[in-house]
Amino acid sequence: MIKFALALTLCLAGASLSLAQHNPQWWGNRNTIVHLFEWKWSDIAEECETFLAPRGFAGVQVSPVNENIISAGRPWWERYQPISYKLTTRSGNEEEFADMVRRCNDVGIRIYVDVLLNHMSGDFDGVAVGTAGTEAEPSKKSFPGVPYTAQDFHPSCEITDWNNRFQVQECELVGLKDLNQHSDYVRSKLIEFLDHLIELGVAGFRVDAAKHMAAEDLEYIYGSLSNLNIEHGFPHNARPFIFQEVIDHGHETVSREEYNQLGAVTEFRFSEEIGNAFRGNNALKWLQSWGTGWGFLSSEQAFTFVDNHDNQRDQGSVLNYKSPRQYKMATAFHLANPYGIIRVMSSFAFDDQDTPPPQDAQENIISPEFDEDGACVNGWICEHRWRQIYAMVGFKNAVRDTELSGWWDNGDNQISFCRGNKGFLAVNNNQYDLSQELNTCLPAGEYCDVISGSLIDGACTGKSVTVNEHGYGYIHIGSDDFDGVLALHVNAKV
């Protein structure tokens, strides 16, 4: 009986920890993360204070923070080839990182770090030098900056069969030296690295290449981490938020269900299907059952996005900034729908798979510059600064904890729905106008469409909609309008 009680206690404790790791630790009613891909720490700190906090964003996913290999031309993916756990990259050093985390936390913006636990750098001719000046010999699996030696890695092998669990989890992903997370020593170094970031005030981690590590090894690592730092405004006993990169199209040998109890899981099918719909390959009317009805993970387990830094560079259904009208519609739907834990992308312009972030002649990352409307102009795309996107972050905050209701569609590519009695969204992806009286579910009054403009000094700078005492309003979205979406909410009432 004593053994049974102890086993039950340990089981419940483990379940409690894993449940806590699904909590993003947002501040107030904020509930949207933005990925400021390849931004410098000093620029993120300023963005938190001057843009993200005033517009209601909840958190920032940052690029990998630890020292990486220096690759010719400085492609973005060099950040995913670590050679030590020193906090020095092209985004800045440890002091600048710590300052950024503190300043962002001070204004209610949480920081989530993209962490590389699966591997170290791939092969390099001779001695490699990292962004902190550390030397390593990746071909010999020698990383003195940690230190790691060959005994800390799985034996070298290539992934040739993606249906072979051993290859997926113990061979080298695109040639990257595969760490043995079952080793007590490797586990200790990874835990030490993550705990240091927790001490500096981060709220959680995106775990890169999680499916290439055994779930039981990750469970041990996550369970060994410190609680979040209360000096940065986190409650006592708060656990780091974990979201794990697991690419699972529904027929994978290593499945998302192995990881979704440990933390949230990236729902890549969400990205593909929302792209299909707004590219016109699937009628929007089918989005009425969006979420688990499409075979996605449960909402609290699903980390969702229209695109990410990887798949935005692929050919296929995934939308990116290069299709701006469809991208804004898809993002508006994403932010208006209650499904999933949401991240929006903030990119830099690219022409190919290897394009580096905007940099100067000395290969230093440059700071974003802005025009009079606040949009980025010097190689940074900054989708999060597009009015149609940041306004929907405000919409999402306004409708938090309400249900989707009042669905309407025209049997094709015109849809609308309510979020309780606090918000309304309409989308027109047809080649003809949407002009109709629709139920907005809102209290009577005049509302600004936050897509086409803003509420400033009691007046709308864009479209407005008058809602009658029955909640109905006349909705018009022309087929040739600049934006194919209209959004109203109670905080934009005139």
Swiss-Prot record:
UniProt keyword Hydrolase present: yes
Keywords for this protein = Calcium, Carbohydrate metabolism, Chloride, Disulfide bond, Glycosidase, Hydrolase, Metal-binding, Pyrrolidone carboxylic acid, Secreted, Signal
Keyword Transmembrane helix in the entry? The reply is no
Q: In the record's cofactor note, how is the cofactor described as bound? A: Binds 1 Ca(2+) ion per subunit.
Annotated site (Transition state stabilizer), which positions?
Answer: D310
Cellular component GO terms held in the UniProt record:
extracellular region
The cofactor named in the record is:
Ca(2+); chloride
The record's SMART domains line, in alphabetical order, gives: Aamy, Aamy_C
Q: What is its EC number?
A: 3.2.1.1
| PTM sites of type Pyrrolidone carboxylic acid | Q21
MF-aspect GO terms: alpha-amylase activity; metal ion binding
Q: Binding positions for Ca(2+)? A: N118, Q169, D178, H212
Q: Which residues are responsible for catalysis?
A: D208, E245
Output one GO BP term: carbohydrate metabolic process
InterPro entries in the record, alphabetically? A-amylase/branching_C (IPR006048), A-amylase_C (IPR031319), Alpha_amylase (IPR006046), Glyco_hydro_13_cat_dom (IPR006047), Glyco_hydro_b (IPR013780), Glycoside_hydrolase_SF (IPR017853)
Localization annotation: Secreted
Provide the binding site for chloride.
R206, N308, R343
**What is this enzyme's catalytic activity, as reactions?**
Endohydrolysis of (1->4)-alpha-D-glucosidic linkages in polysaccharides containing three or more (1->4)-alpha-linked D-glucose units
Disulphide bonds annotated for this chain are: C48-C104, C157-C171, C376-C382, C418-C441, C448-C460
Give the family this protein belongs to, as stated in its UniProt record: Belongs to the glycosyl hydrolase 13 family.
Q: Which PANTHER family match?
A: ALPHA-AMYLASE
Which proteins does it associate with, and in what oligomeric form? Answer: Monomer.
The protein in question is named Alpha-amylase-related protein
Q: Which gene is transcribed and translated to give this protein?
A: Amyrel
